[in-house]
Amino acid sequence: MAELLLGVNIDHIATLRNARGTAYPDPVQAAFIAEQAGADGITVHLREDRRHITDRDVRILRQTLDTRMNLEMAVTEEMLAIAVETKPHFCCLVPEKRQEVTTEGGLDVAGQRDKMRDACKRLADAGIQVSLFIDADEEQIKAAAEVGAPFIEIHTGCYADAKTDAEQAQELARIAKAATFAASLGLKVNAGHGLTYHNVKAIAAIPEMHELNIGHAIIGRAVMTGLKDAVAEMKRLMLEARG
């Protein structure tokens, strides 16, 4: 069974800051608190429209984190150049639409193999580990392995949004099957999107899971309980699921 890690996404600390155009709350300070509470890494999504995390945030976080930085980004020339310059520990390549509220689905790796292969090589040559954010689909998983990505991150949005227990169980089985298949190809498996304190345990219990990236639920809980307690509680639930 893979060691299970928690990556805390702090995008919505920046969302709150940017809502009033202030210098607070500071994502860098939030990252420090999350690390102290047990986060194994910090995830930020530098979107093309800079709606929350900024270039400055990325630079400072890269210089100050004690754990690992995971930079989520679209597969564009601008973002690849920023990543190569900044050199985060990990880059997770994601699809991106300007009009979306949050990432709506996985990358179509199978439909753009050459583009993805070039991006993975460019990042790997800069010493960056690459993850591809994809749906729990065998064709996409095979394509991810073929283009040279060492990691995938399985999109858990459909599982999180399931309206019935039966639908959620079906989505969970699909994710578990995908994780097993990915591991059989030598890929390391992460997961994220829509995971909460109520639904995380079943995903955490999947033996192949290496890291869960969770943000909105933790920041939402932090408003009520404080960030340190919110991160610690999520980590406790994940590890409890592993027995």
UniProtKB/Swiss-Prot annotation:
Changing G194S: In pdxH null mutation suppressor. GO terms for molecular function: identical protein binding; pyridoxine 5'-phosphate synthase activity. Keywords: Cytoplasm, Pyridoxine biosynthesis, Transferase. 3-amino-2-oxopropyl phosphate binds at N9, R20, G194, G215, H216. The record marks E153 as: Transition state stabilizer. It catalyses: 3-amino-2-oxopropyl phosphate + 1-deoxy-D-xylulose 5-phosphate = pyridoxine 5'-phosphate + phosphate + 2 H2O + H(+). It is found in: Cytoplasm. GO terms for cellular component: cytosol. The active site is at H45 (proton acceptor), E72 (proton acceptor), H193 (proton donor). Pathway: Cofactor biosynthesis; pyridoxine 5'-phosphate biosynthesis; pyridoxine 5'-phosphate from D-erythrose 4-phosphate: step 5/5. 1-deoxy-D-xylulose 5-phosphate binds at D11, H12, R47, H52, T102. Its EC number is 2.6.99.2. InterPro entries: Aldolase_TIM, PyrdxlP_synth_PdxJ, Pyridoxine-5'_phos_synth. The keyword Transferase applies. It holds the Pfam family PdxJ. GO terms for biological process: pyridoxine biosynthetic process. Catalyzes the complicated ring closure reaction between the two acyclic compounds 1-deoxy-D-xylulose-5-phosphate (DXP) and 3-amino-2-oxopropyl phosphate (1-amino-acetone-3-phosphate or AAP) to form pyridoxine 5'-phosphate (PNP) and inorganic phosphate. Homooctamer; tetramer of dimers. Belongs to the PNP synthase family. HAMAP family: PdxJ (MF_00279). This is Pyridoxine 5'-phosphate synthase. It comes from Escherichia coli (strain K12).
